[in-house]
Amino acid sequence: MMPPRLPGGHGGAMRSRSSSSGHHLNTTFHKRRRRRQQHHIGGSHISISHGSYLALLLLSTTCSLVATSASSSSSAANTDIAPPDPPPVSQVSIASSSPCAPQHWWDSQRDRCTPCTRCQGEMIPLRPCQLHTDTICGSIYDLKIDWVVLAKTEPNWKERRKSSEYEHFEHNAPLQHLTHEQLQQLHEEAAAAWVLDWQTGVLYVAVLTCLVFFSVAACILIHHMRQWRRMERRLDQDVEELSTKLMAKLAEVQSLDGGTFFIGNADALRGLPASAATTHPATTQSGIFQPQHVLLPEKRGKHQERRILKTLQPGNVYIEESNAGLGGMGVGLGVRGCSGLKG
């Protein structure tokens, strides 16, 4: 606790600071005195708190030691008074006797090793022979088998069977007995499921076969379509070639009989002289024909040409003649073996 201030101490300090230095010294003395008193009070409180803490710690340790000593003495007295439990006879006998040979188990009633029982006939061992128990025989109907789970084709049927077997061995659950009718019903359900699986497999195979057939047919159809297109292109080319040859033959025949016929590039030959027309007959034959209707000369000229062609021998012969019908222009005629006239 801080000591009470003197009345008018704070105001006197303010006045002393403003009026004289004597009052200032007095106030500083009082301040130092107050600080010393505060430090003295705080140190006494700290020393008192540390002392009380140490006293409480010593008291608690002594109480705990007394309690532990009392509990140990009482437990020792109880153990001295109570007699020890006698060990069981079976454990003493087993510990004193030698271990049994293989395929033998210890019979506690007879106090000796006994050969394990062998299952006869259709009986199967439900539980094998162990050190303290004999073999347990039974039929297949005595087994704990979940036929419904076995009939289903699930991915985790093995795990379920293992878990059920472990639960049976751990908890010693009673064996489930299935009647002949129930077993027959389960077999019928399994057969129906097998038939359904077989039908499903056949359906899958049929669908796969159809898909393969249609895919092969589509490939063959596409191949034949390509072949037909190639044949059509070749046929068009052959038809064009035959048409050009036919037009050339028709021109040869009509030039002999009279009338109109077709020649190639007739406009170009109109302005050429007779010598140029005779020197370029092959080019006019092999070039692309541009159909032009040209009137042949009169019948007198045609008869004269026929007479000349009859007297000619086989070969290419070029004849130049000018008459009024042709208008003074030379025409080159090529004859190949008297078979036709090409211009």
UniProtKB/Swiss-Prot annotation:
TNFR-Cys repeats lie at residues 99-137. Induction: Down-regulated by bacterial infection in the gut. GO terms for biological process: apoptotic process; negative regulation of neuromuscular synaptic transmission; neuron cellular homeostasis; photoreceptor cell axon guidance; positive regulation of programmed cell death; tumor necrosis factor-mediated signaling pathway. Residues 1-76 form the signal peptide. GO terms for molecular function: tumor necrosis factor receptor activity. InterPro entries: TNFR/NGFR_Cys_rich_reg. This is Tumor necrosis factor receptor superfamily member wgn. It comes from Drosophila melanogaster.
